[in-house]
């Protein structure tokens, strides 16, 4: 604990020095010209980085040079700053220029998630007066924020996006090739799980329980009683799930896709995708599955209730309800014509989260109103 505090304090000193140095350059007229909006992303090649990169790419197509992305908030000395992570916002908020308009996402988190989450939420709520806008991706989270006393007019409900032109339903040839690549046998039911559900960025043998890896394994064990199950995993830190599948005697493959095109091909092998989390902001795999024509059974978390109509465009169950997850999965897998109607409905539902739509909404609902208030 003492070492963590020392590291944390050292980081804060570094943040302050960097931020005040950049502000001094700006006052001297030596800071480079920037677009009016800066999105702060994470260095890790994962969801927050992708979120910011795709919004910026699409927004600049709509309104050229309106936004840029950075991993260094100290470089943002004027204009609008939008943080892709509420944790980044918390780390940097005391060192940012008061000339800036402040925006952050709040994608997930609730008091029931434990002491650390509760402390973070309390600190976040203390910071709300400093914020001009808060972006929530899901109705569940927006309603939660309002219940905690956040003014509704500060919250923009904008989904996390999906590359619907990249994540497309597989052709028969693409499906056969993907399944052959991972050694799937004839008649096996391939269930996908593409996420990070271990603690840290190593092997991930300690489960990140908020992601429900224990629920996933319990659901697979139940489905194995009735079906020849094969599990396809992607994402880092999957050691806990891999060990669990080996104990269950379930055949599986784990492939960490090096890029988004490779990730899209993994969905071609799937018959079903399971989201078994206890808390989510999206997840991105929910939208990617629906866009790819892969049926989803999800717990009632994140964007799932906004996108899925139970029995029409997927399956929706309460968190931790293993029996319900297995029942919905069996029901969907037994639908006629390969669940074609459900797949079609799912893809239509997810189009509201195409990145071009998401970027347009950030421009119209968040950035432009703040630019007008600033006289920009």
Model-predicted segments: where are they?
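Nucleotide-activated donor-binding/catalytic signature segment of Leloir-type glycosyltransferases, i.e.
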Residues: 229, 235, 239-264
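Short hydrophobic beta-strand element within catalytic cores of glycosyltransferases
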Residues: 295-298, 308
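Conserved catalytic-core segment of nucleotide-activated headgroup transferases in glycan assembly
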Residues: 180-181, 186-240
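Donor nucleotide-sugar binding/catalytic pocket of nucleotide-sugar-dependent glycosyltransferases
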Residues: 132-146, 151-173, 184, 192-196
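Aromatic "clamp/platform" in nucleotide-sugar-dependent glycosyltransferases that forms part
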Residues: 278
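A charged, aromatic-enriched C-terminal amphipathic alpha-helix characteristic of glycosyltransferases
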Residues: 337-369
């Amino acid at each position: 604990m003492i070492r963590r505090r020392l590291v944390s304090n050292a980081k804060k000193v570094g943040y302050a020095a960097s931020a005040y140095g950049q502000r001094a350059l700006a006052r001297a007229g030596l800071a480079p010209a920037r677009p009016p909006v800066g999105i702060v992303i994470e260095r890790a090649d994962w969801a927050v980085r992708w979120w910011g990169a795709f919004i910026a790419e699409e927004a600049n197509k709509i309104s050229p040079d309106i936004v840029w992305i950075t991993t260094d908030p100290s470089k943002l000395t004027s204009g609008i700053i939008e943080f892709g992570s509420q944790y980044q916002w918390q780390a940097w908020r005391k060192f940012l220029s008061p000339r800036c308009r402040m925006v952050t996402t709040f994608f997930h988190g609730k008091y029931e998630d434990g002491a650390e989450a509760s402390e973070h939420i309390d600190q976040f709520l203390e910071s709300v007066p400093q914020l001009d806008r808060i972006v929530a991706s899901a109705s569940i989270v927006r309603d939660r924020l309002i219940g905690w006393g956040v003014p509704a007019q500060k919250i923009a409900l904008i989904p996390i996006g999906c590359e619907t032109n990249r994540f497309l339903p597989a052709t028969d040839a693409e499906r056969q090739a993907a399944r052959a690549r991972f050694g799937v046998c004839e008649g096996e039911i391939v269930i996908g799980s593409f996420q990070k559900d271990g603690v840290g960025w190593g092997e991930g043998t300690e489960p990140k329980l908020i992601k429900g890896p224990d629920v996933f394994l319990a659901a697979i064990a139940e489905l194995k009683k009735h079906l020849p199950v094969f599990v396809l995993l992607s994402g880092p830190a999957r050691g806990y799930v891999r060990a669990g599948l080996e104990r269950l005697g379930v055949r599986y493959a784990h492939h960490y896709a090096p890029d988004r095109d490779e990730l899209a091909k993994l969905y071609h092998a799937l018959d079903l995708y399971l989201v078994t989390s206890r808390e989510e902001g999206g997840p991105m795999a929910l939208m990617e599955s629906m866009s790819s024509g892969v049926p989803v059974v999800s717990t009632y978390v994140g964007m799932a209730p906004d996108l899925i109509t139970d029995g029409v465009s997927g399956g929706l169950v309460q968190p931790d309800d293993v029996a319900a997850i297995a029942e919905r999965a069996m029901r969907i897998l037994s639908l006629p014509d390969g669940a074609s109607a459900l797949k079609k409905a799912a893809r239509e539902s997810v189009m509201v989260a195409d990145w071009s739509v998401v970027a347009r909404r950030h421009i119209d609902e968040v950035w432009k109103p703040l630019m007008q208030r600033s006289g920009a």
